[in-house]
Structures are given as C-alpha cells and as structure tokens.
Amino acid sequence: MPIADRQTRISLLWLPAFVPLWLAGCGGYGGGGNGGGGGGSAPSAPTGLTATAANAQVNLTWNASAAATGYYVKRSTSSGTEVQIAAQSATAYNDNSVNNGTTYYYVVSAYNSYGQSANSAEVSGTPLAPPPPAADVTITIDPTKTKPISPYIYGTNFYSGNTAPQPNFTFDRAGGNRWTAYNWENNYSNAGGDYIYNNDLYLCNAGCNAAIPAEAVRTFIAADQSAGLASLVTFQLQGLVSADGNGPVSTANPPDMTRFKTVVDKKSTVSSVPFTTTPPTTDANVFMDEFAWALDQKLPGIFGANPTHPTFLSLDNEPDLWNATHLEVQGSTNISSTNFITKSVTLSEALKDQFPNLVIFGPVNYGFNGIYSWQGDPSLSPTPNGANWFADKYLAGIKTASAAYGKPVVDVYDFHWYSEATDGTTRVTNMTGSSLTDAQVQAIVQSPRSLWDTTFKENSWITNSVLGGPIYILGRLQAKIDAENPGMKIAITEYENGGFNHIAGTIAQADNLGIFGSLGIFAANFWPPGGTYSYTLAAFRAFRGFDGANANFGDISLQSTSSDVASVVVYASTDTTAPGRVVFVAINRSNAAKFTAINGQALSGTAHLYQMTAASASTQSVVQPVSMGPMAVSGSSLTITLPAYSVTTIDVH
C-alpha cells in the first residue's frame, strides 16, 4: 500500500481507546484546519468587517466566507477580549444593546459542520446620541450685563378690593380718578366723570370709619402692610377736594365752591395752628403737609428711609385729563403744563420738608399724548424725535427746582400705559373675550414690544399719525431722563394690554413683567379691568410663586437677546440670596412650537419646569403654572421646546 495510507493506519492503531474516532484526522475545532472524514474543511475567516456607530446602536457588516453556514459575532469593551454575543447566518448584525459614549470592539468568525474559522480583523464603534436639531430660536445671555430688579414691579391697584384670587403681589396703589378730590379730613371724594360727579364716602368702605380723618388711606396702607406689600397713595394737587357727601355736583358753572374746599400745600403759609390728627372740618382749607404728618402719626415710620414696606406718594392722578375727568372742579379748560409743573414743585417741597426721605411720583400722565404734548398744550410744539415733548419740559423744570431745593423734588417719572395697539380695527384693551382671531392674538402678544423695541411698529394712531414709526416709550423716556435729570426712576402705575380671558393676555403680561425687570423700571401696577382677568393674573405667577408656594424670579436681571423676538423672548435672572440659582421665563408668542437654545449662562444642578399653555389653562379655574418635572442641566447651554403660545418658567438650582 502507499506510504501515506500505511501511516494513517498506524495512527489509528495507536489511538487511545477513549478518544472518539470522529476526532481522527480533524483539523481542530475552531482552529481553521482541514476537515476529515469526507475531505471537507472549516470556512476561512470573514473579511471586510465594518462597524458603523449610530444612536444607541452599532451596525456590523462583512463579506461572506466560502462554505460558511453561519457566523459568530463577538464583542468586548476592551480590545482583544471579545466574547460571543450572537450566532447567525446573515452577514450583517445590528447591535442595539449598547450605551452611547462607550467604545465597543468586534470580531466575527465563520463556522460550518467542520469547524470554526479564525477571527476576522478587529473593528470598533462608539455609539453617540445624534446632535440636537438646529434651534428655531437662539437666546443669548450675557451674564456680565446685569441690572437689579426692583421689588415694586409686581404691583396692582387696590389690592384689597379685588375679589379674584391674587398672585404674590409686592406693591399696591391707591389710584384712579376718585383720589383727585379726596378730602382726608372727612374721607369724602368725588367720582368725577366716572359716576355723575358724585360726592360720597365711596373710598371709605369696609373697615373704614369715616368719622376718623384719613381713615380711607390709613386702612389701605395697613392692609397692604399686613399682606406684605409696599404702598403708593395719592395726594391732592388739583386744588379742590370734596366738602360733603351729598351726592351729584353741578357742572353747569364749575366749581361750585359750596361743595368743595381749597387745598393748601403747606399749613404754615396760612395758619400758625400746630398739626393735628383731628383737624376742624368747618374751615375752608385742607392741608397736604398735615395730611402726611397725620398718616405718619397713625402708622409711624411709613415715610422713613428704609421701612420694611415703604409708602410712596403720588402727585395726584392723570392731570392731563382733569378737564375731562373732573369737570366739577377743573372746568373745561385744563391746567397748563407750566402751572402744573409749578404746583408739583410746591406740593413736593411741602411734603419733603416734613419727610426728607419721601419718594414722590409724578407727573402721572394718562398716556402717550400726555407725555408727548400735555394733551395739546398750545405752549408745546413736540416733534417725534425732538427734545420738545411735555416730558422734556417737565424734566427740565424738576431739575431746576431740585437744584434750588437741594434734593430731587420728584423721584420717579410716573405714567400710565393702556396699549393703543389694534388689529387694524379693534384696540387690544377691548379684546377681552375667550375667543380671539389670530390677528387679535398677535396684536395683544406683540403689543408690549412698544415699550422698548426700536424695530417694532404697532398698528395704532400713535405710530401711524404722530410718530410715523416705532414708539419704544421706555427707551425714549430713559434717554430724556439721562440727558436732563439723571437718576430719576420710571414707573408705570396703570397699564393694560387686553386678552384678559385668553392665553394671549398671559403672554403679554408676562412680557411686561420681564421688560420691567430687564430695563430697571422702579415700579409698575397692573390696572384690574371690570369682569374676569384670570389669564392676566396668571402671568404674575410665572414670576412669583410659580411652584405654588414661594419660588420667585431672581432679583438680578441678565441681559438677554433673541434671534427672533417676534416669536420667542426669554428673561433671565440670578438670585442674590441663592448663589448659582438661575431662573428663566421663556415666552413663545408664536402659533407653532419653537425649539429654543438658551446660551451663555453657566448652569448646574437641575432645571425645574413650570408651564402655562392654552390647553393647561382651559382646565383650571385659577390659571397658574403646571409643573413639568425636572431636567438635568450643565454647561452654559440649555435647549427646550416651547409649545405654541406658552409661558415657561425654568428654575435652575
């Protein structure tokens, strides 16, 4: 026989009895040798192995090996230590049991009935989450540009008289037409044109004893202090106050001096009688400095340097409309701007002689035309971009008087702002229902931009017929103050933007509050309309008590700019009482969800989200933020999808 056959036979004869015969002549299991028994062999090692990493998966492909009936897929997180994770016949494998950010190593071997091949060349893949989509809107925060946020911007008018559930207000104002002819000695006032020019005790309501002088004001301030609010009360500048409570006053030949008494700013100019908290009511005069003194006697320290809940004083109310609202005392000819400034200085000095630290608000313009032209004062010839508005004249007069007096005679430039924006037909303040058109919604939610935005032109008589362009009233006023009377503050003590029963009202009001804080406005008081306005009050809850308790927006504003201010704005703050805490209020005033990136402010910890939308509000009797749960944050960027027409508070700590 051939030599080779003899060698095979000898090998079989010497094989130990316990070794199975099928092993004889095998090339070794898994070693890639030649098979025996039938002349077959194990397949060769696979070639062309590739690994493609994706989000939470690694996809493998390789070339088929001749004679292979299947393949072993092997994996490890360190090179050269792979273990089998799958056996299959296909030449592709999707490994979806992986973690993003971890590198995985792979080899593949082929097998058939004769054995297993050697391993393929090793490959690796690192699955990663996909990058976030491009932001619809980018918000850029500059933490180096900051302003303190005044605690008095979260204000209202006649807090105690409001029956709706109130948010966490900080500031209350006793304002409105009623206070112009209020007589502190007897608590009578006149309604003016609001109600048949009626002399009555309207201001001395529940808990007020009209027989006690100044009780209408004392009870107002006391209630505010009990609620933790600062107060703004109105002092009488027009010149006449109600003598009685005997009903309507004739306007046929005003004023009827049998029904009114004369206001005197400084008692010592006409009388040597000392101040008293119980002045006679039979004389002809009512003294303003005595009024302030009496309030301090009743509520000691309210006009001090830094009381816990300060009381500020306002020099009357909307004097540029006295001939319309208070015909009974003013007549049909209004006070001139010159006389008004003179009277303001005289009253302010009389009050500050008594209380040097008193903070005084004026001129309390009713709106744009008062600021611009004193409602058509013939001594003024204002031009849109000129330094010849009533505001310029007022600031110059106050500056001159302050220099002579040795301190500011008016501390805060105060005006009212009932938005004049329209949808082309209807003014936003008249859009009060729960069903609004898209055009009406946009008119409301964009209207706050007229406070500051030099690129935004609302549709109103102001922009179309007077200025011929954007209003940006706060920017204009601040520039005039900086030029003429640096250091004077700004307040808006009555304002409305409509949408009281619609998410549009929530958005507009939240925007107002963000604007007030970011621009350093000193004080602001929302004017509650008649009827319901839960959606507007809800906006305060985005800044105050948004967690249903006492979590508030911070007290330092960070500069924020938006790549699409018509769609999304974000207001940013830090908290001096909690280092590292950052609070954002993000407003989407568009009708589509916006993926928003907020960049530039270092963040750490957890973001707690609270949100208001039309859908969430529709299920609530008291509209308020809904907790959306936590979100981990780090670095200096945060991304979030803001629902259409929504207000979202993001509290990072």
Where are these regions (language model features)?
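Noncatalytic carbohydrate-binding groove/subsite architecture in carbohydrate-active enzymes
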Residues: N285-L299, E328, S336-A504, Q509
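Pro/Thr/Ser/Gly-rich low-complexity, intrinsically disordered linker/stalk tracts
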Residues: G36-A67, N100, S113-P130
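Beta-strand-rich modules
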Residues: D95-Y114
